[in-house]
């Protein structure tokens, strides 16, 4: 396995819409200081050159804190900058093709909403799964909340680790206690905090208490 359950405990997913007066680099560093265990760089608007530059800078930053950086969707960019891996959705590149491009030692995470998708992703070589949206989410308007029983069934249907995704924050994360997850993937629950470092630390304490 290319990633441990411990590295999936509190997984930060970047979102440029929360930047305000800060740079993404500054926000990510605050999250790292607060204790995030994995960072996913997700960009939907940058051109390839800017995305590559940002990826290289964040990779160096994350490695300074001994935290892996993975890239959302863009397998070619992940390979180019030697990122630690990728996260791909059901409509993105096939897992076996991503593995061929990246090599055996890179992290491949996959979104899985159903037991069938979870089992198929594990069989194809995924290292971990992201399942949800457990509480709905502002980052994807069409993401309806998943029944927590179904989320738990997804976790129990595979041997690889599963993280909860979707609308998770310090106010609701304790509702996930006992659901067999490895950790949580969080966007606004980290980056929308007025004090990102403090908010991250408080969220990490809650996540650690339920897994």
Regions found by a protein language model. Give the residues of each.
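Glycine-rich beta-strand-to-loop/alpha-helix junction loops that act as flexible
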Residues: 131, 163-168, 184-188
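Active-site phosphate/pyrophosphate-handling residues
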Residues: 76, 149, 185
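Conserved N-terminal beta1-alpha1 strand-loop-helix module at the mouth
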Residues: 1-93, 100-128, 153, 159-160, ...
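Residue-level signal for pocket-adjacent positions within structured domains
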Residues: 14, 138-141, 163, 185-186
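Flexible, gly/pro- and Lys/Arg-enriched active-site loops
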Residues: 90-96, 134-157
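C-terminal binding/interaction regions
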Residues: 179, 183
């Amino acid at each position: 396995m290319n990633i441990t359950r411990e590295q999936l405990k509190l997984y930060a997913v970047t979102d440029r819409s929360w930047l305000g007066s800060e740079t993404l680099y500054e926000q990510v560093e605050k999250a790292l200081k607060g204790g995030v265990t994995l960072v996913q760089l997700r960009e939907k608007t940058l051109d390839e050159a800017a995305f590559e530059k940002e990826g290289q800078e964040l990779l160096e930053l994350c490695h300074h804190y001994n935290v892996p950086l993975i890239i959302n969707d863009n397998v070619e960019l992940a390979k180019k900058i030697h990122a630690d891996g990728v996260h791909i959705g059901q409509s993105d590149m096939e897992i076996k093709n991503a593995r061929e491009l990246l090599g055996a030692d890179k992290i491949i995470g996959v979104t899985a909403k159903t037991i069938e998708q979870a089992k198929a992703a594990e069989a194809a070589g995924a290292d971990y799964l992201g399942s949800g949206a457990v509480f709905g989410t502002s980052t994807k308007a069409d993401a309806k909340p998943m029944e927590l029983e179904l989320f738990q069934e997804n976790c129990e249907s595979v041997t690889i680790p599963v993280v909860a995704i979707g609308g998770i924050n310090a106010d609701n994360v304790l509702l996930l206690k006992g659901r067999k997850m490895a950790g949580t993937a969080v966007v606004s629950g980290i980056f929308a905090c007025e004090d990102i470092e403090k908010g991250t630390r408080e969220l990490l304490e809650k996540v650690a208490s339920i897994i």
